[in-house]
Amino acid sequence: MKYGIVGYSGRMGQEIQKVFSEKGHELVLKVDVNGKEIKDSPDVIVDFSSADALPETVDLCRKYKSALVLGTTALKEEHFEMLRELSKEVPVVQSYNFSIGINVLKRFLSELSKVLSDWDVEIVEAHHRFKKDAPSGTAILLKNALGKEVPIHSLRIGGIPGDHVIVFGNVGETIEIKHRAISRTVFAIGALKAAEFLVGREPGFYSFEEIVFGGE
């Protein structure tokens, strides 16, 4: 598989390159703040950079007919409209979190929330000091899985890759569910799974959850 990375010089870009290369895939396109380096047409482009970079990423996908794996957070409706239009031409997958564990947790929470519908519930998320958006896209993803408005408490401290705690409370008892990303490698592994899934697929807007659960 030939692939490209938008945000190549960033922390996630470097992690993606490492994980993809270990599987024998060929990096043929690099994009970062210093410009572009293109060797060949990529089968898939992976972008974990910033929402501001999305228009250029979409243009590259159209130019090379590349599938898109998008892990950028803080997207607005205008960005989703761009993705919907692009998905008519190439396969696209977008997620605020490419951890397999988070996507399993998301499905679990949607069921648990039905059983504990009268319980209080809040979310606490912590990330490294350089993360710009708060609450995190993952916290919003988990809130949406709960199916109701819940308070989200955000911490930006140190070098934490990503902690998410969901606390359910009732009179006399609490349930705490925690997911911790130990390193950024988990997100790169998820991006690889998504990229390998998309190559050769028909155009469309795919979810990472359906990739994790085999199209259920």
UniProtKB/Swiss-Prot annotation:
Active-site residues (renumbered): H127, K131
Class of this enzyme: oxidoreductase
Domain of life: Bacteria
GO biological process, one term: lysine biosynthetic process via diaminopimelate
Catalytic activity: (S)-2,3,4,5-tetrahydrodipicolinate + NAD(+) + H2O = (2S,4S)-4-hydroxy-2,3,4,5-tetrahydrodipicolinate + NADH + H(+); (S)-2,3,4,5-tetrahydrodipicolinate + NADP(+) + H2O = (2S,4S)-4-hydroxy-2,3,4,5-tetrahydrodipicolinate + NADPH + H(+)
Pathway: Amino-acid biosynthesis; L-lysine biosynthesis via DAP pathway; (S)-tetrahydrodipicolinate from L-aspartate: step 4/4
Disulfide pattern: none
GO molecular function: 4-hydroxy-tetrahydrodipicolinate reductase; NAD binding; NADP binding; oxidoreductase activity, acting on CH or CH2 groups, NAD or NADP as acceptor
Residues annotated to bind (S)-2,3,4,5-tetrahydrodipicolinate: H128, G137, T138
E.C. no: 1.17.1.8
UniProt keyword annotations, A-Z: Amino-acid biosynthesis, Cytoplasm, Diaminopimelate biosynthesis, Lysine biosynthesis, NAD, NADP, Oxidoreductase
Subcellular location(s) of the protein: Cytoplasm
Binding site for NAD(+): G7, Y8, S9, G10, R11, M12, G71, T72, T73, S95, Y96, N97, F98
Major localization listed first in the record, in broad terms: cytoplasm
A GO cellular component annotation in the UniProt record: cytosol
Role summary: Catalyzes the conversion of 4-hydroxy-tetrahydrodipicolinate (HTPA) to tetrahydrodipicolinate.
Family as reported in the entry's similarity comment: Belongs to the DapB family.
Record PANTHER family: 4-HYDROXY-TETRAHYDRODIPICOLINATE REDUCTASE 1, CHLOROPLASTIC-RELATED (PTHR20836:SF0), DIHYDRODIPICOLINATE REDUCTASE (PTHR20836)
Protein's recorded name: 4-hydroxy-tetrahydrodipicolinate reductase
